[in-house]
Amino acid sequence: IGKNAVTLVSQANAHLPQAPLGKIEVLRWKSTDGQEIEGLLTYPVGYQPGTRVPLLLQIHGGPMGVFLQSFAGTAGNYPNAAFASRGFALLQPNPRGSAGYGKEFRYANYQDWGGGDFRDIMAGVDRVIEMGIADPDRMGVMGWSYGGYMTSWTITQTKRFKAASVGAAVTNLVSFTGTADIPGFLPDYFGGQPWDDAKLYAARSPVFQAKGVTTPTLVQHGEADVRVPISQGYEFYNAVKQQGTPAEMLVLPRQPHGPIEPRMILKIMQTNLDWFEKHLKPGS
């Protein structure tokens, strides 16, 4: 006590093999307007400096969520520890709009979803490429909720990613506002209802910008999601699929906005792992 030393007091699962974890470090970079952005960079297990590896960009929910330094081996929709053990690097940025960086930063995405936040994120991707870690020809993007929104938005704005995983995403800001259990959420962010500024709502909706998307896309959505109704997932899935772009939709029976059944969470984790291995590591 008082020395900040770590002391092992028990080891309940000593008989189980210990899975290796990738090194995680805090990364900082400048966005296009000079704003400093912070995030977490996870290296593949056994990473050799100077080697370029597949990069996965994970975008958090919220938008007021935040990535924190914490144990990487917990279960979640995206199996980050497994990704690292399979040779992927992982970037988890905290773009403008994230919590924990002050009020001005928290509200810097007002009326600007898909604007400054997108540029913050892409500047982080460029930084990892500049570091000689990410292979620019083998990059994937993924996220749940607002992270799913940003994932679907990202692939309407750039063709740099070879695969995307869109989870429980808001993809049509107009129809979302009329069907979600939080009808006032987007009006608070956009300064009015869709009928007050239909042009802005449409301009920032991935569905309205989906023409020309070529990124293979996995859409995942809970059938019982009332926060972001499953129709949002179907809208984007159909927009991508009808253009001839590879697309799959995983419907999760009984699941709300955040999946709660262990077997469903396991299904999501395995599906995401398989999806990115298929598209970023062909032949593996």
Predicted regions and their residues:
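Serine-hydrolase catalytic core recognition
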Residues: 1-284
